[in-house]
Amino acid sequence: MVGNLWFDRETGVTTYNVEDSEYRLLTAGADVDADAEIDPTQRAARSEGRSPAAILVSTFSDELRSGTGGLARAIGVSVKDRGAISMAGHAGTAYWFSKATGEFVTSTYYLDEYPDWVSDFNRARPAMAYADTSWTLLHDQDTYLFGDSDDRAWEADVAGFGRTFPHEYGDGESPYFTTWLTLSPAGDRLVLDFAKQALVNEKLGADDITDYLSVSFS
């Protein structure tokens, strides 16, 4: 794919790279929240569906699955839909974090229903564990090379997350709560925790067939 979005000469409109109206998201209300989405490429999507249809070549996941007669398991996990889908390809399974629901989701291109372990993970609402907490520095500020440069006029205060540490996540009620998570290590932790559940519950690497778990931290 040439980018996150492009102008489609046939339709005459800008197209988001993984949007596909043929394959809805499995979770209702999990698509882009236009009122709270800060990523212009996400807002450009005109469809609530997602798939790898725009990937015109075979991916590593596809070749691995093909080379093992479909026995290899391939899973892509990311905070972004385009990250997970590009790694999972056409023959794997992609999961990504929905800022609209605070859950990991996929589309009907990949699955007709969630495995129990995915439903259990989402039911526990792991994103809410960060409510009433903050993103703080790991060490004392004066131990960092540019520790005295935390506040600069050209820094953006993204959706009210603040320009200086600590960055407060708030009580979880803000429409930007999940966005703030994805802008911080909390988003990476959620992705990692979900990927670990995929590793265990899908029994990746448990036999002699090579499996593929791709994880995108963004």
Model-derived features: where do they sit?
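His/Asp/Glu-rich, glycine-adjacent segments
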Residues: 1-209, 218
